[in-house]
């Protein structure tokens, strides 16, 4: 993080830290530092499945094909290789979170907490940040943060109206990502109390 934060800030600007994955990384580090299960559980319920999709999409693009377009930036040769290499934390973070969840326990409050946080981030990205395909003075600045305009940063989706897509996107995240992850973690992971008793 000592390297990643200043490098990302310089190249991508502060709005880059509004991506779910970057918020998740920051929460994970603070959670590790403070030994707080809730701070680990929040990103776990929110990004375990999306980061798995990121990994699959990256491998597909590495093989010369396109799946969702969400990792296209990793193959953008206008961006320094070192900068793109820093983004490989996406592939490691899910495994770290799983390790920490089993160690510290899964806090059931994470579902409501992450849903509120993610919804707020989506609204900020939709109303205040550049949309997909926007022409910016600095081409490195983030567009389409958290995919609120579609899965491709190069152009907005055209399946439905932008506002309807936003509402649908948030609903799908809750129904298809956060809820299943919550129930899975609730089933297979200890509670913070159980984890603490086991460590004692």
Where are these regions (language model features)?
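Alpha-helical membrane segments in multi-pass integral membrane proteins
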Residues: 86-92, 111-133, 139-146
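Aromatic-anchored segments of alpha-helical transmembrane domains
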Residues: 1-6, 48-57, 118-130
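Short, aromatic-rich membrane-interface segments at the entry and exit
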Residues: 13-20, 38-43, 110-113
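Membrane-embedded alpha-helical segments of multi-pass membrane proteins
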Residues: 17-30, 88-93
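Short, hydrophobic transmembrane alpha-helix segments
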Residues: 5-14
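Membrane-interface capping segments at transmembrane-helix boundaries
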Residues: 180-199
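Membrane-interface transmembrane-helix boundary segments in multi-pass integral membrane proteins
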Residues: 133-178
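Membrane-proximal helix-loop-helix units in multi-pass membrane proteins
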Residues: 45, 49, 53-118
